[in-house]
């Protein structure tokens, strides 16, 4: 089974359109969005409309959670006073632009989606002989919508998160930096866990300004005892970055956000 997953669009319509066109071309079996549809760019309503039009299963990001409740707190972790000041402008701007219908939609979004694959070893006794391979979709982490799971997270800490979530694969976003880590654990037999950060469609921070999403392939032979039960492809998609950057500069959003798009920082 091939699944397309993307996250952190952040109101960047040109980036989303490019990603969706690429997904359409590849024709996966399923598509999921892991949140943060709004914030930092000028097209929050248009992004929400596109996701709704396609009926893409979507979870709430921290920014969606805040805007859905007309809050002036996006649950973001800003490092400097300048970032905090810019962040206040962004959430005020987004609250002003998002319509009532779009805001109501954001409030309906769940905080996680679990997809269980029941892998039958004996077709005549499906339930009694089935192994479950579990995929958990979250925005930040299974514990908090705005928890950052960076690539250098301590392995023991990350394993605890997997064990508490009872998941074989956890896909998430929030950091805007893509990676795939394979961890091993389990008492009786080795069990492999996959941590997959999807990166960002509309606001990458890994030095590559192209939009990013993931194609996740789960073969029929998938099981927790194999490190090859999940194939992860990070797909980078060109889009008109300059159009998005100039749109920011022509709005009351901070110009720093335009440079962030150009430099992916």
List PLM regions with ranges:
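Beta-strand-turn-beta hairpins that frame and shape the catalytic cleft
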Residues: 1-3, 115-136, 189-194, 228-230
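N-terminal active-site segment of His-dependent metallophosphoesterases
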Residues: 1-56
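Active-site neighborhood of phospho(di)ester-bond hydrolases with catalytic His/Asp-centered motifs
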Residues: 6-7, 31-36, 57-62, 138, ...
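Short active-site segment of divalent metal-dependent hydrolases/proteases
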Residues: 11, 38-39, 64, 142, ...
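Metal-dependent catalytic neighborhoods of phosphoester/phosphodiester hydrolases
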Residues: 15, 37-54, 67-79, 181-184, ...
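Active-site neighborhood of divalent metal-dependent phosphoester bond hydrolases
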Residues: 47, 54-116, 121-124, 132, ...
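Anionic-ligand binding region
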Residues: 152-186, 190-198
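Acidic, His/Gly-rich catalytic cores of divalent-metal-dependent hydrolytic chemistry
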Residues: 182-265
